[in-house]
Amino acid sequence: MKFLFDLFPIILFFAAFKVWGIFTATAVAIVATLAQVAWVAFRHRKVDTMLWVSLGVIVVFGGATLVLHDEKFIQWKPTVLYWLFAIGLLAARYAFGNNLIEKMMGKQLTLPHPVWDKLNVAWALFFAVLGVANLYVVHNYTESQWVNFKLFGTTGAMVVFIILQSLWLTKYLKDE
């Protein structure tokens, strides 16, 4: 259910794009992300840093798209977001000694610290590659194809990455 909740703004963006085009879809994505943050704040009293970053990036890049009437800004938004996540994961670990992946998943999984470090780097690389893939699609395909990639391509890549990661992690999990 959380996975669908996380996809809420993207799904609404996709639907609005198909009906009204990129600029209305951008406005819908901004409002949907604001609503998502408001709901999380109301329901849980605490909003994850990643969601705040997502909100900031959609407001800045979506706002630039609407104000300047240039769709390139919203198309660059996923790349900027993915690269911020990648940099954040690596900076937290290597500059501040905090493994954010371990902090997020440590209660669910018991893993040796070197495995957590590999997982952290894997996620950072995954986000970096997603950012590059997004730029490739933006510059080599139509706007409609990019929107399809944004929903189906990146979501599919995420699912495949999580499955592969889960298979890799099974050798480190202890029978409980």
UniProtKB/Swiss-Prot annotation:
Membrane topology according to the record: Multi-pass membrane protein
Segments passing through the bilayer: 3-23, 24-44, 49-69, 81-101, 119-139, 149-169
Subcellular location: Cell inner membrane
InterPro entries, per the entry: YciB
Keywords attached to this entry: Cell inner membrane, Cell membrane, Membrane, Transmembrane, Transmembrane helix
GO cellular component, one term: plasma membrane
Keyword Transmembrane on entry: yes
HAMAP family (UniProt xref): YciB (MF_00189)
Assigned protein family: Belongs to the YciB family.
PANTHER family: INNER MEMBRANE-SPANNING PROTEIN YCIB, INTRACELLULAR SEPTATION PROTEIN A-RELATED
Function comment: Plays a role in cell envelope biogenesis, maintenance of cell envelope integrity and membrane homeostasis.
Protein name: Inner membrane-spanning protein YciB
Organism field: Burkholderia ambifaria (strain MC40-6)
Gene behind this protein: yciB
